[in-house]
Every structure is written in C-alpha cells, then in structure tokens.
Design a protein with these regions (language model features):
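Intrinsically disordered, low-complexity, mixed-charge
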Residues: 1-94
Length: 94
C-alpha cells in the first residue's frame, strides 16, 4: 500500500478537475479525497496499491480537458489506519 499527498497547480479549478479525479480514482480502486484551495490549486490524498496510485498520479499530472497542470508536488505518507475510509471523496474547499 502507498499513500501520498499531492498539491496540483495551474488551471485546475473550474474545469472539472476534482470530479474527474474522483472518477479516475474510483476506477483505479484507490481511496482518499480532493479539494480546491483558496490559492487556486488543488490538494489531494491518494491511497492504494502502488500501480493504482501511480496511475492516478499520472492522470493528475495531465488533468482534464480544459485544464492545464503546471506543477505537482507529491509527498509520501505513512499508510492511513484501516478505519480512515473506503472511498474517494470530493471535499469542501479548504
């Protein structure tokens, strides 16, 4: 299992980034969350099997049509407790 925190910059708000990421994450079978930040970036946490996390990260670096990712910052985290969640959710803006 692998868990990462990701900050994404660029044109990533108002282009469907969070909801498309939720769909991509659910199809990959990972858990976590995504939210918009006030500075115009997107913040996310992704956890799952290594290959699934890598696939989601690859999508996050590209983003949806209409978006333009200029940077991603990935920080490796310790695995979450088993009770941390079983889905990938879109959170309220932070």
């Amino acid at each position: 299992m692998r868990r990462v925190h990701v900050s994404v910059t660029g044109t990533v708000q108002g282009v469907g980034y969070r909801y498309t990421l939720q769909h991509v994450a659910q199809r990959a079978g990972v858990t976590g969350w995504v939210r918009n930040l006030r500075d115009g970036s997107v913040d996310a946490e992704v956890e799952g099997e290594d290959a699934a996390v890598d696939a989601v990260l690859a999508w996050m670096r590209q983003g949806p049509p209409g978006g333009h990712v200029t940077g991603t910052h990935v920080v490796e985290l310790a695995p979450a407790p088993a009770s941390a969640g079983t889905s990938f959710e879109v959170r309220r803006d932070g």
